[in-house]
């Protein structure tokens, strides 16, 4: 089944007993905005999981701005949200799918395949006249036992080994000006990991906020697909392991589930002063 589902698809299934809908809205720089938006209106039955409180570990010296939680800690959080090993999960946000894609990746990392991202997001759902509510769901905790997939994850040592290795392609998912080092609004150093190519994550969607077709995605991600077809490894990163996830999801949708996420991403890379930095190159 496709990892992206439509609003109409969700509407037809939203009251199924084995479904958990997760509201992932979150705004960088306004950490309270997502939960406030959820309290104001959300899809009926949805639970709220916060990017920084639930889907990330506390920030330390290394690991980036949104470190991965320990697998058992993350599994316990999902269980408290009513997500068990047999639960179907649909995630949504209003940030172009990056937070929902982070939840999709995290669940798959823990071995849970029955997880999807709703196309377009909550604003489109509400604008389309679909039902919304301000009532909170009564959550019945579930049992979630993780079955970790370590092959989905790349760490800083993996990326260091990739430097100069023709068998590995690094893919930077940030905007072109951040990749080039022309500006850096979030991190203390600007630029990118040497040898990386740039494929901005927002380009997996069209102007209307809907995910592009398979053909359009293949065109957008052509260099990555070509590399993987040649047997090369692809490691995708962004600023903190969130906005890279739509690129990872798009590649998975196109039949390339072996792609890796560098979860610490740029903010982890620059926390090591010895790591090299490049600017103004493709």
Question: What are these regions, as identified by a protein language model?
Answer:
Residues 1-282:
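Cytosolic catalytic domains that perform sulfur/thiol-centered chemistry
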């Amino acid at each position: 089944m496709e990892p992206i589902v439509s609003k109409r698809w969700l509407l037809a299934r939203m009251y199924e007993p084995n479904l958990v809908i997760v509201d992932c809205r979150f705004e960088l720089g306004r950490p309270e905005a997502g939960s406030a938006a959820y309290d104001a209106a959300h899809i009926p039955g949805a639970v709220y999981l916060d990017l920084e409180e639930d889907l990330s570990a506390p920030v330390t010296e290394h690991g980036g701005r949104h470190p991965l939680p320990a697998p058992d800690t993350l599994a316990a959080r999902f269980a408290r949200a009513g997500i068990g090993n047999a639960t179907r999960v649909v995630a949504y946000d209003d940030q172009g799918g990056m937070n929902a894609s982070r939840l999709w990746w995290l669940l798959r990392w823990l071995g849970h395949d029955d997880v999807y991202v709703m196309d377009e997001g909550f604003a489109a759902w509400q604008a389309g006249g679909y039902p919304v509510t301000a009532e909170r769901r009564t959550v019945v905790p579930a049992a979630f036992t993780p079955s970790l997939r370590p092959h989905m994850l790349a760490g800083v040592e993996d990326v260091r080994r990739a430097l100069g290795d023709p068998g590995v392609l690094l893919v930077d998912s940030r905007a072109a000006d951040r990749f080039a080092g022309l500006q850096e609004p979030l991190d203390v150093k600007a630029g990118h990991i040497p040898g990386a190519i740039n494929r901005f994550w927002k380009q997996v969607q069209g102007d209307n906020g809907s995910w592009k077709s398979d053909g359009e995605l293949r065109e957008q991600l052509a260099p990555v697909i070509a590399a993987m077809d040649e047997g090369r490894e692809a490691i995708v990163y962004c600023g903190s392991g969130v906005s890279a996830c739509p690129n990872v999801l798009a590649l998975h949708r196109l039949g390339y589930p072996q792609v890796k996420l560098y979860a610490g991403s740029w903010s982890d890379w620059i926390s090591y002063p010895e790591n090299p930095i490049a600017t103004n190159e493709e």
